[in-house]
Structures are given as C-alpha cells and as structure tokens.
Amino acid sequence: MRQSSKAASFKEASDDLEALAEVSISPTHLQRLSERVGKEWAQQRDREVQAFREDKLVCAYAAAPPAAAVMLDGGRLQTRAEDGGRGVQEPAWRENKVACCLSLSSTEQAEDPQPEPPSKFLEAPRVARLAAEVKSRGRPALGRAEAKPAASAKKRRRKKRRRPASKKRVRTVVASMANSETFGWQMAAEVKRRGLDRARRKACVCDGQQYNWTLFELHLLPWGFIGILDFVHLVAYLHDAAHAWKKDRGRAWKQYVQWLRWAWSGQVKPLMASLRQATSDLGEPPQGAADSDPRQTVKDTLGYIQNNRTRMDYARYRRLGLPTSSAPVESTIKQINRRVKGTEKFWLDGGAEAILQLRAAYLSEDDRAATYWARQRPYARAVGAGRLRAA
C-alpha cells in the first residue's frame, strides 16, 4: 500500500514491487487493493470524526506540545463520471483539501528575534521567481519576464543560516475530497486527537482563501489559535503591485522594499495608506478588466491586505515562536499531487478519496499507517475471489 500511494501510478508501483521486492502484482489488482484499504481507513477516520462531534474522542497524547500549528491549503486533481462506461466521460478539475497538523519546539521571546527581512526577500531575481511560483495559478505577473538570476563567476560566500524560530516535531496530514464543512470537522478531529488544542502557543497559517479562514473561525479560533497570513503569498502580492504602480524597474523595486519592511514589522496602516495612494494614482480599473491590468493588480493587493489585516502582526508572531509561512502544507501538497495530479489521470470520487487516505497516512509521522494495520480489518471478500474457474 505504501508504494501504491507513493509511486506516480499503479503501473509504476507494480513495476517497483516486481523489481525491488520480487512481488508480482498487476496494476489493476493493486488498484483494487488500494481502493479497498483506503476506504477502510476513510471509515476509521469518519468514526473518529463522529466521536469528536459527540465529545467522545480520546486524545492520543498525555502531554500537550509547547507550540502547535495547523496549515490549510488545497491541491487539484481530475475526476470523471461514475457511470460513464469506458473512457473518460465528463472530465473536471476538482480540489482536494489538505491540512498539516504540526507540533513545534519553540520558545517565546521578549524581543523580535529577526527584525530584518531575510535576504531572500531582498534579492530581485529570487523575489521575482518566488512571486511567479506563488502566483502561477493566478494572473500573469508584471515585472517578471526579464527577472533572471544574474550569472556570476565568483562563488557567493556561504551565509550562516539562521536557526528557525520554530522547529517541527511531528507532522500529521489530513486530506480529502469532501466539501469544506466536512473537511473542517476532519481537521478539527485530528487537532483534538493530537492534543494540539492544548498547546499554549498555537497558530493557523494559511493563504488568503476565504474558506480556510471560515474553518479557522469555526474550529480553531475557539481553542485560542492565532490566525496568520502566509507571508510568502503576501510578498507575491506586494511584488506585483509595486511593478504595476511604478513603471521604472528601479523605482518599483524601491517601492517593494518599503512595503516589504512595513509588512515584515507588522505595520499595516502605512502599508494600506501607500496602496490607497497607488490606487488613487492609477485610477479604478474598468469593469471586466484583465487580472494583469495594473489598476486591477493594485486594487486586488489592497483588498487582499484589507481582508487579512488582522493576521499580519508578524513581529508578534516571531516573538511567540510561531511560523509565518505555510510552506509545510505546500510541500505536502506537492507530494500528494505527484500521486494524484496529471493530465492523464482521471479519478472516480471513491478512488480519489481512497488514495488520499493512503497518501495522508504514509506522509504522517505518527505511525498512523502502522496503527491502522494493527487493527482488526473488517471481513470482506478477497479481491479477485471467484475469478478462477473450477478445475
């Protein structure tokens, strides 16, 4: 099951098992086994969710971690009609939702441990690449076409790496094709099972998607979690807006750096005031303006910050030893996407949900898969039983 959930396809998993373990199992048979086990694990998850909703879920850990973080995001995969016969009928892109639940080791400090922005946010080529990657699924970016890393014959001096304010202890993963409401309960049950709700310092780090913050306010805010806007997504917006406002590249970069420093230190008021000035200078975008229209870019950035201004006190978050980046969940989604996303992959809903449960279990660092295997499995007819004729 591990290789079935990790390899890029059932065919690749079948080949790996043949080559590495000398186990011969067809891709079709492996798919059936994976769907069956994945559905069993989904049923176990649903039982835990029901126990949580009935206030009967038992925490699996005696001691609470010193700090915790929950990070939410979504990936994408393609589905097809359930009863469409052979071939792909009614293909559609669907979102799979993912949560990373992290216990952290960190300390609270009286002063901001890193008052200056990291160098990666102050180097134009790196920022351009970073912004392009973050916004690649959205509108075309301004000021990026010429942004290429400068060639240099000299090797850069190796900089002393700053130790992160918080260090991950254990990661567990929740992934599902369910709607937002159902997924919210799945995420909350995992937080409760891990005892992350009892951490003294805890954060929910997300990008600006509204449904993420709806789940935060419903499930995590009552437990005292602090909502934090992912700083890297904010950098992408600031980079785009600066190049939309200032046509000269040098002036645009200078404007971006000023906005970056305000954002890094949590000074939201001057940042919003400057963006309002940019909006006034450029004027309102016409109805139906393209996302790449400079007026629309600046307006979108101002709206993004207005909607998330209460989640941008970054200096305070660093003092509390909390993360300000949702990179762990984005990395997890890349690992999941390798298995489920592709132009040639079209899933039925049940198959997608099953493989997500397998992938989430094996990506979790609490031996969840081993725990599931140790439980008595429900009786079911063997996969492939009755297919052989009597002699």
Question: What residue ranges belong to the model's regions?
Answer:
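Catalytic center-proximal scaffold of phosphoryl-transfer enzymes
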Residues: M1-A391
